[in-house]
């Protein structure tokens, strides 16, 4: 007799035909005790990984460390914003103070004061109002401008992991465009162009100063990140070693505890009272 004809294959089997098959023997071999044990040991310990991706570096930039502190780049952006606010306040407030005092004196020639001190005090109050008004106006604008510029520049540098003059140009274009966006599309385009033209030479100047100092900010950042990664990798390896030694310690502990427990159980059984004899056994006696 010839061999029976093969069973017809369904359309679903035909559709899954090109895909690789996994047989039960292969699955059993893959789930061998050594493989399962190694997989279970490593499941509770996560690999620290490396900061090779740009998004990983950006997340690390804005993340806090073990002491709940931000990175040095964020601290630099904050300090630069505060310094820019102080400089902007002085830049806008001091000329406004002088101008407001002079204008008040010119406009109050016909006024009558009780004494000279009253006149000087009135002029000083007018100058102080001008200092606060125009100083605050220049202060917050300068602080926001510097913050946006440094944030964009630092973000591009960290994401691409290198310094480039184009980062300063892009940061200047973004900052200038945002500050002129209230003037419409023309203001946005004009502000972006002016910002890029001003950012490029500023970037070249800062890069030249960094090279002259011997170590750039990016080189220092890479050293710090490399040291941090090595520290986390060492911690991960030590935790992995502890995880690998834990089953052995548990097994040795069970081997020590089991004989003692068995002996104690036997002693408890022997110390139990014997069962009373049945009436049938008593009649035989």
UniProtKB/Swiss-Prot annotation:
Region Disordered: start-end pairs: 265-285
InterPro entries xrefs: TIMMDC1
Bias-annotated ranges (Polar residues): 274-285
Location relative to the cell: Mitochondrion membrane
Parts forming coiled coils: none
Membrane topology type: Multi-pass membrane protein
Primary location group: mitochondrion
Domain of life: Eukaryota
Record GO cellular component, one term: mitochondrial membrane
Transmembrane segments annotated in the record for this chain: 80-100, 137-159, 165-185, 188-208
UniProt keyword list: Chaperone, Membrane, Mitochondrion, Phosphoprotein, Transmembrane, Transmembrane helix
GO biological process: mitochondrial respiratory chain complex I assembly
Keyword Transmembrane attributed: yes
Residues found modified as Phosphoserine: 277
Keyword hit for Transmembrane helix: yes
Known role: Chaperone protein involved in the assembly of the mitochondrial NADH:ubiquinone oxidoreductase complex (complex I). Participates in constructing the membrane arm of complex I.
Sequence similarity: Belongs to the Tim17/Tim22/Tim23 family.
Database matches in PANTHER family: C3ORF1 PROTEIN-RELATED (PTHR13002), COMPLEX I ASSEMBLY FACTOR TIMMDC1, MITOCHONDRIAL (PTHR13002:SF1)
UniProt subunit comment: Associates with the intermediate 315 kDa subcomplex of incompletely assembled complex I. Interacts with TMEM70.
Protein name (record): Complex I assembly factor TIMMDC1, mitochondrial
Organism name: Mus musculus (Mouse)
The encoding gene: Timmdc1
